[in-house]
From Swiss-Prot:
Signal peptide boundaries: none
Annotated spans, Disordered: 1-39, 477-496, 670-689
Molecular function GO labels: RNA binding
Highest taxon of source: Eukaryota
Composition-biased stretches (Polar residues): 677-689
A GO CC term assigned to this protein in UniProt: preribosome, small subunit precursor
Source organism per UniProt: Paracoccidioides lutzii (strain ATCC MYA-826 / Pb01)
SUPFAM superfamilies, sorted: ARM repeat (SSF48371)
GO biological process annotation, one example: endonucleolytic cleavage in ITS1 to separate SSU-rRNA from 5.8S rRNA and LSU-rRNA from tricistronic rRNA transcript (SSU-rRNA, 5.8S rRNA, LSU-rRNA)
Protein known as: Nucleolar protein 9
Function summary: RNA-binding nucleolar protein required for pre-rRNA processing. Involved in production of 18S rRNA and assembly of small ribosomal subunit.
Annotated Pfam families: PUF_NOP9 (PF22493)
InterPro entries: ARM-like, ARM-type_fold, NOP9, Pumilio_RNA-bd_rpt
Length: 689
């Protein structure tokens, strides 16, 4: 079929016409003013208008709207990756050498801080540097981040650097505040050229984020930073187990321990914060929820990203701002639960009941139970929980909320709750859901509730046979299979085995039938099974507690230690068994002949113990060097006549002090303001006949 006749060069002519239209200056001006909204990216628009000219002082913006700070070249990546490896190995000879190395890395990173923070391969170096930095280095880095926090907190890698920076800077805010107050008392004028205080740097960072709280609340990475900021402003502990779970997930890797940095112990305690922090906290909390209606706020309760932020908001509101804040109509708690009387079929009661069974919302309910005012909790327990606590205990998710509820009950309420939970104990034992039972035992010990009915129920659930009882409780059949080589890894433990071990440890803390259930089972098993228990990393804690807790009677300790005779050296060379050997030292405090027999076993295997890391620890904890050289001193320690950690050999042997000891004593006495130390022997004046 003949083709249609077409003119040659039509495409080139059409392209030439388009180029003529674009290069027309009048068209360019109209396009710049009217069609600017068609460009989703401002930098792309400037690139089209200015041709190949890109201003060097302006940052590029990628298609997602976040700033792009550039990439490290290959040499820089290799250098910083090598520095990260050296910091993680932490094989510096002295702290001074480590400080010099960190300062050199900071010098090399000068001007590249934002690139490093946003780098997938080098952002971990930034976290390690922050963990090992001094306060001046943290201030310097904080100042480099100022002006970029809105983009950094939303970045996948830089957000972790921001969290690390805030956490480590928070521990210096209190010390700076104390120094500032002491200077004011002394009426000292501060240098006008001095660097900004961390207090001011924090406030600048918060001011950058203002106006964006609404979408940052549910942003995947920025929400973590918001939680940290709330806790820092409130002065709450940042390394407390109760707050760590809401700051980051369980998979969060804390790099401070890897670089050998010891965090200030005050970071795990409540901090004193400046007055400006309290004002900034109130404004931040108000801005976070002002634009949200009650329906959206309740939806956040089951939102996987927004829920942890809501937990921190509630915790800070109820614990930091006082219980009276809950009465405020604009408070987070009152907006979530507006019904003050909690009617059975009301909207608030329905909302709270739904949180019990939601895997995300139940965590918010735990926070409400922990921190809510007493009046609200009593009403909540009476209307919603009291008659349903048995059914709540059956559910795997609601059981965690029940544990928090049991922690706040009085003795009478705890007794009635236990009566309702007892019928659910056998099915809970069968499915290895033991957290509620463990909480009942622990709270019963604290409140002084009779735990006899619970012991009888556990006896019927686990069976009368002592051997099968301990096997079912600690899941020893699984451990035996691992020892036979049928399991790929013997170091991993199942949740059922862990929960059974924790339940047995709680039972050992109770005097009476609960403790006897575990002790009788440990005495009934064969010595081989007892050794396997001692060598298991999870269930060995049961044997350690059975030996050392006050509920352990001399008769029980005498029987259990005799079954370990001949196996002490084997246990001392095992990573888990060595802890059992350490527990045998206080367990045989009134059984000196047993302790001497164990010491003889250790002496026979001295070479093997000294060649092993855990063996050397056992040798040191048992003071075996003293046993070989000064048997009398060792026996005095073994009987508890002397401190086991530090032996005063001068007292034991009546050895007089040397001249250097006397000189040290005189120097210490002069430092304390006295002329002569009290224990300095008086000089004898020769008498003339």
């Amino acid at each position: 079929m003949p083709r249609e006749k077409q003119k040659r060069g039509r495409r080139a002519e059409a392209k030439r016409k388009r180029d003529d239209v674009i290069t027309d200056p009048t068209v360019l001006k109209r396009q710049k003013s009217s069609d600017v909204s068609n460009y989703p990216n401002r930098s792309y628009e400037q690139l089209e208008i200015r041709g190949d000219y890109i201003p060097l002082d302006e940052e590029l913006v990628d298609s997602t709207g976040t700033a792009f700070y550039g990439l490290l070249d290959i040499e820089e990546q290799e250098y910083f990756s090598h520095a990260s490896g050296l910091l993680e190995l932490n094989q510096f000879e002295t702290e001074e050498e480590k400080s010099i190395f960190i300062e050199r890395v900071y010098e090399e990173a000068n001007g590249k801080e934002l690139k490093i923070a946003c780098s997938q391969s080098c952002s971990r170096l930034m976290e390690k540097l922050i963990s090992a930095s001094t306060v001046s280095q943290i201030k310097r880095l904080f100042s480099k981040f100022i002006g970029h926090f809105l983009d950094l907190v939303q970045h996948r890698f830089a957000s972790h650097c921001c969290e690390c920076l805030f956490i480590h800077a928070a521990q210096y805010v209190t010390s700076e505040m104390k120094k500032k107050s002491s200077k004011e008392k002394e009426n000292l004028e501060e240098d006008s050229t001095s660097e900004l205080q961390l207090e001011d740097l924090f406030l600048k960072a918060i001011s950058e984020l203002e106006g964006n709280w609404g979408y940052l609340l549910t942003e995947r990475f920025a929400s973590h930073t918001i939680r940290v900021l709330l806790l820092v402003l409130a002065g709450k502990p940042l390394r407390n187990p109760s707050t760590t779970t809401v700051i980051a997930s369980r998979k969060k890797e804390y790099l401070a321990s890897k670089v050998g940095t010891q965090l200030d112990p005050s970071i795990s305690e409540k901090q004193a914060v400046p007055t400006s922090f309290n004002k900034a906290l109130e404004k931040m909390m108000k801005d976070l929820v002002t634009g949200l209606d009650n329906t959206y706020l309740r939806a956040l309760a089951t939102h996987p990203v927004g829920n942890p932020v809501l937990q921190v908001l509630l915790s800070v509101e109820l614990s930091h701002m006082g219980k009276s804040k809950a009465k405020d109509a604009d408070s987070v708690l009152r907006r979530l639960v507006p019904d003050e009387n909690l009617q059975e079929d009301g909207e608030s009661a329905t909302f709270l009941k739904g949180l019990f069974y939601d895997p995300v919302g139940s965590r918010l309910l735990e926070t409400i139970v922990q921190d809510a005012p007493g009046k609200f909790f009593k009403l909540f327990y009476k209307i919603i929980v009291r008659e349903r606590i048995g059914s709540f205990s059956r559910n795997e998710i609601a059981g965690h909320v029940v544990v928090r509820i049991l922690e706040r009950l009085s003795k009478e309420d705890l007794k009635s709750a236990m009566d309702l939970i007892l019928p659910e104990v056998p099915p809970l034992v069968e499915r290895s859901r033991l957290t509620v039972i463990k909480a009942l035992i622990e709270r019963g010990i604290v409140r002084g509730v009779d735990l006899g009915p619970l012991a009888a129920t556990l006896l019927s659930a686990y069976g009368d046979d002592a051997v099968s009882r301990i096997n079912n409780m600690l899941k020893l059949q699984r451990s035996n299979k691992e020892n036979d080589g049928t399991t790929s890894s013997s170091n991993t433990s199942s949740p059922e085995q862990l929960h059974g071990s924790l339940l047995a440890q709680a039972m050992l803390k109770s005097t009476g039938p609960l403790c006897e259930l575990v002790q009788s089972s440990l005495l009934a098993v064969t010595p081989e099974t007892l050794i396997s228990i001692a060598q298991d990393p999870v269930v060995s804690h049961v044997l350690q507690d059975a030996l050392t807790l006050p509920t352990s009677t001399p008769q029980f300790r005498r029987q259990i230690t005799s079954r370990l005779s001949g196996k002490i050296a084997e246990l001392a060379l095992h990573s888990s068994g060595s802890h059992v050997v350490d527990a045998l030292w206080p367990a045989t405090r009134d059984l000196i002949f047993v302790k001497q027999r164990f010491a003889e076993e250790l002496v026979v295997h001295e070479r093997a113990l000294r060649d092993s890391f855990v063996g050397r620890a056992v040798w040191r904890n048992w003071s075996m060097d003293l046993y070989k050289r000064k048997r009398g001193s060792w026996i005095a320690i073994a009987k508890g006549l002397e401190d086991s950690a530090e032996v005063n050999l001068n007292t034991l042997t009546n050895k007089p002090k040397s001249n250097i000891d006397l000189a040290r004593a005189r120097f210490a006495a002069k430092a304390n303001g006295s002329k002569e130390p009290a224990n300095t022997p008086s000089k004898k004046i020769p008498t003339t006949s």
